[in-house]
Amino acid sequence: MDILSLGWAALMTMFTFSLALTVWARNGF
């Protein structure tokens, strides 16, 4: 795996986690 695909995967993971956390916080609090 090269650095570009690794960085892209990390970016998508961070974005998905951030979005899920925002939705969870909004519904939870």
UniProtKB/Swiss-Prot annotation:
SUPFAM superfamilies on file: PetN subunit of the cytochrome b6f complex
GO molecular function: electron transporter, transferring electrons within cytochrome b6/f complex of photosystem II activity
Origin: domain of life: Eukaryota
Compartments it resides in: Plastid, Chloroplast thylakoid membrane
TM helices/strands, residue ranges: 3-23
Record text on subunit structure and interactions: The 4 large subunits of the cytochrome b6-f complex are cytochrome b6, subunit IV (17 kDa polypeptide, PetD), cytochrome f and the Rieske protein, while the 4 small subunits are PetG, PetL, PetM and PetN. The complex functions as a dimer.
UniProt-recorded name of the protein: Cytochrome b6-f complex subunit 8
Gene source species: Phaeodactylum tricornutum (strain CCAP 1055/1)
The encoding gene: petN
